[in-house]
Amino acid sequence: METQCRPQVRCLDPIQGKETRVTVIVRGRAIVAVEDDSYPIPADAAVIPGENLLLAPSLADLYSYSGEPGYEDRETLSQLVKTAIAGGFGDVAILPNTDPPLDQPQTLQWLKQRLNQIEGVNAHHQPPGDPQAENRPDSAPVQCHWWGSVTQGNQGKQLTEWGELDQAGVIGFSDGGAIQDWRLLQRALEYGAIAGKPLALVPLNLSLRGNGVMREGPLAIQLGLPPDPVMSEAAVIASLLELLPHYGTPVHFMRISTARGVELIVQAKSQGLNCTASVNWHHLLLSNEAIAHGLPPHTPHYDPNLRFDPPLGNEGDRLALIEGVKSGVIDAIAVDHQAFTYEEKTQTFAETPPGAIGYELVLPCLWQGLVEKNLITPMALWRALSTNPRRCLGLPEVSNSRILFDPDQAWTLKRGTLQTSAYNSPWWNHSLKGRVVAWES
């Protein structure tokens, strides 16, 4: 196995806000040493310039969906873990929207046992004929965390036994969707203050949304798609701002998607409320213009893979979300990874289920779309993808592992280049740049 010496690698420390240059020794796809640039080069090492590489803490994901149990035809737990590792994630938090849902301790125990059976996650799977196989890590640590259901069956009608789920080891509580019963939500805030774990809420009023699938505005009218008004998000955030001062529950606002939503989060934080917020990464790169015009050269307009929940906003929303991440008002960028089958994502735009895969795409796409365009710094991006998600989850901000990222490595998103069988992404068949090439564990 070849040993490589990569001098002059950029090393990011988002905790200290420092950037240095180091020498990284890589064997296969494992980082075996990180030294300063005075480190003597091993006699058996091939010296390859490392100026373009980035060494930084592994990433952390606040929330995503697992197909297992119940939806293994979409994606198995093994595939989810492997695609997360390939994307550079050391911590992933899974929503309780499985079948059965994670509303009882027994389901969590089953998931933990199932995860322990996936020994192959540390012996990285390489699909036959995969042109990127030689650039992936052999082994890497990933820690799975689980959100416990707020309500039984995630139906928003009756609270689960929070104490039992807490003792079983959930990272926090969420239904993965919008809770509409405000009296029940008030009780959840009361229980959350006792548990002391984050309560992740989707700010969405379903009555105001109606059957909307595209953000309300001229483009929705032009395309003939049912509109979803900004107020369906903003009204819920504003109402929660009235409730939160009365409780000590750490609340996380999921999937902020509008400029008005960002303004309300600014207001919440200026009041000193115990809250954090995140944005789905697609909303930082895409606007509703993509639905109208597609993503050249391979993604057509009305592409079902461009349907998200919440829907993509206008360009003003996108820029406000980017500024929110840069300023820290939006604490974290969430992957919100959700696999679907071919049959599910080849329906009409209004009928297809919302969501897309993301673990292996989020870092290269955000690097290309934001960092290379000087819309965000590498340090700010890493805080939003690594340090801050861990803080929002109540985990230590310092990762116990680091990844080596090559932002210049070219590849094409197609069958055989991902560690998941799902391919519901608007970037399918697109040429991309950026890959995680090694892990330090």
UniProtKB/Swiss-Prot annotation:
GO function terms (MF aspect): allantoinase activity; dihydroorotase activity; metal ion binding
Gene3D superfamilies assigned: Metal-dependent hydrolases
InterPro entries listed in its UniProt record: DHOase (IPR004722), DHOase/Allantoinase_Hydrolase (IPR050138), Metal-dep_hydrolase_composite (IPR011059), Metal_Hydrolase (IPR032466)
GO cellular component: cytoplasm
Source organism superkingdom: Bacteria
Assigned keywords, A-Z: Pyrimidine biosynthesis
Chain positions covered by the region annotation Disordered: 121-140
A Gene Ontology BP annotation from the UniProt entry: purine nucleobase catabolic process
Described function: Non-functional DHOase.
Family statement drawn from the similarity comment of this UniProt entry: Belongs to the metallo-dependent hydrolases superfamily. DHOase family. PyrC' subfamily.
Protein name per the record: Probable dihydroorotase-like protein
Gene: pyrC'
